Amino acid sequence: MPSSTLLELAPNTHSKCKFETRNRSSSSSSGCSSSSTELYDLAAAHAALISRQQQILNQGIPIIPEHQLAAAAVAHHHHQLHPSVQHQLVAGHHHHHLPQVAHHPAILPRSDVIQQPSHFALHQHLQNLVQQQQQQQALHHHQQLVGDMALVSHTHPAAVGSTTCYEKNPQKQQQVPQIPTQPQVAHVSSNAILAAAQPFYQPPVQDSQPDRPIGYGAFGVVWSVTDPRSGKRVALKKMPNVFQNLASCKRVFREIKMLSSFRHDNVLSLLDILQPANPSFFQEFTSWHLTPSIHHQRLISHIKPICLFFVLPLVSLLCAHMYVCMWWHGTALLEGRKETITYVLTELMQSDLHKIIVSPQTLTIDHVKVFVYQILRGLKYLHTANILHRDIKPGNLLVNSNCILKICDFGLARTWDSRDRLNMTHEVVTQYYRAPELLMGARRYTGAVDIWSVGCIFAELLQRKILFQAAGPIEQLQMIIDLLGTPSQEAMKYACEGAKNHVLRAGPRAPNLQSLYRLSQQTTDDAVDLLVKLLKFNPDERISVEEALSHPYLEEGRLRFHSCMCSCCYTKANVPSRIFSQELDPKHESPFDPKWEKDMSRLSMFELREKMYQFVMDRPALYGVALCINPQSAAYKNFASSSVAQASELPPSPQAW
């Protein structure tokens, strides 16, 4: 009987790997990628925040900030803990209520939190668990119970990560949405205490939802699958034809490198990379290309004086010999093509902003402010990392029912240097959200192209339809001019000459900015002011992401987000009010060096493939256990045949001026 899931544990799964216990309830199985996702009432949630905080204080549950949780995770790398402790560390990313892990093997409670007797019992019990850690027997039957159920699998213990994997079960009745803030801390903390008291390991409860496709694009196919290590739903992205050409190899390596560095509430992060089934594939694949060149060189050096009549038969025999050797060593050509697919696991969200916009549900002005604030907040994180997204659109903005938004899809993203504007392709950004300089063939552009896209999305949220919906690039440019007026020569300094002449031939046209007030009945002066600054024709005059975040229109959105939605702010048991982070809109901790892009451009296909392979193999697997594709899964046939978007499904190409 074929198993139901696409992912399974890798064949070389370590027998002593430990997995965290996962206690699931009906309220924890939330959301799927569907257009019916209902958003929380932000105003009601904000009004109930104070009473909920008081409830937390009465229960005496410790809450710690994010940076202490990070320190706890670092300490965990040095000390193997009981699976229930691992569960607390993983869950701590979303619920800041767990005891701090010291660098000593013992689990020490925080001194600044009033502790209940249950916490002292937990402390003593965890100490006993750590002392008995080396004496526990490995659960060798776990792979037999779980391995056949999942699409991916794991190998050996390593680092512990945190996930944000939510998906609705369409077979279950939808729960009334509640913002997952401090009131849920009591429930999760009690579950953690009960889990720590269990003397025996319990395997994670598998999600019963079937694996299914949830989206595809020009560079990949995304499936919703179950991670057998945790039982959670995650997104599996399949990127085919990685080594088809040098440009494709660079794009995939760039995307994986970026996703691995993201740690932000509003940017999708990488959970894991599936290691190749054949670890020596890259070396064997390289030999396919190198060996013929060596044989050909030797052949040519020996057959120069020989008649051409003998050349073709010898070459044919040589090629036949190569393929026989590859078959003899178990490396078939078709198998090599199969291995050019790269699989990555990311967080799974419930829906995206496009589905929310076209749905019949109500979008209040509070929702608009919170969404726009989060888009700009995530964009600041990317721009400070020297990354241009170059495809900001509602479909690439994932949303959960709690209104958390994450920027995704970095297939077109690349690093850049603000001090040295290099030529880049203008075939980026979906047409409806493409900045005018890109429409006019500019090759040197900045992060202002992302800012323009945010302005288009802002207007789309207000009026619930696309702002500039044109059939082609020329009509798109004309719609922009109809709104903003004819640009000056200075505003078109990055455009190509053909585009400039086209605009000037049309004659001058006055701006029509007053039409922005008709986007919605709730459009205010502040909203129009921010829109106008986001939609400046001249990219040098367009507002920066930092300036946009400080705009008065987004003050309420910032307050709502950091009152009950973010992970950077926290609440202490002995402090009645929420403690806000000093950096509400954080920057990237380690920006990409612009030299990295230049160095990568000098690499050959073989060198780049070697670097990519080394990066994948050196990266520790999530939970310390690697995964692989399960060919026995019932969904494997459909998964293997799923392909990227065809040329006819893609947006029109930019105008060739």
From Swiss-Prot:
Output one GO MF annotation. ATP binding
Gene Ontology CC: cell cortex; cytoplasm; nucleus
**Location(s), subcellular:** Cytoplasm, Cell cortex; Nucleus
Catalytic function, reaction form:
L-seryl-[protein] + ATP = O-phospho-L-seryl-[protein] + ADP + H(+); L-threonyl-[protein] + ATP = O-phospho-L-threonyl-[protein] + ADP + H(+)
Active site per database record: 391
Q: Which InterPro entries match?
A: Kinase-like_dom_sf, MAP_kinase, Prot_kinase_dom, Protein_kinase_ATP_BS, Ser/Thr_kinase_AS
User: Which SMART domains does UniProt cross-reference here?
Assistant: S_TKc (SM00220)
Locate the transmembrane regions by residue number.
Answer: none
What's an example GO BP annotation here?
Wnt signaling pathway
Q: Could you tell me which residue ranges the Protein kinase domain spans?
A: 208-554
Q: Which UniProt keywords apply?
A: ATP-binding, Cytoplasm, Developmental protein, Kinase, Magnesium, Metal-binding, Nucleotide-binding, Nucleus, Serine/threonine-protein kinase, Transferase, Wnt signaling pathway
Binding partners and assembly: Component of the beta-catenin-lit-1 complex (also called the lit-1/wrm-1 complex or the wrm-1/lit-1 kinase complex) at least composed of lit-1 and wrm-1. Interacts with wrm-1 (via N-terminus); the interaction is direct and activates lit-1 kinase activity which leads to the phosphorylation of pop-1. This promotes pop-1 interaction with par-5 and translocation of pop-1 from the nucleus to the cytoplasm. Interacts with pop-1 (when phosphorylated on 'Ser-125'); the interaction is dependent on the beta-catenin-lit-1 complex.
Report the family membership. Answer: Belongs to the protein kinase superfamily. Ser/Thr protein kinase family.
| Protein name, entry field | Serine/threonine kinase NLK
What is the source species?
Caenorhabditis briggsae
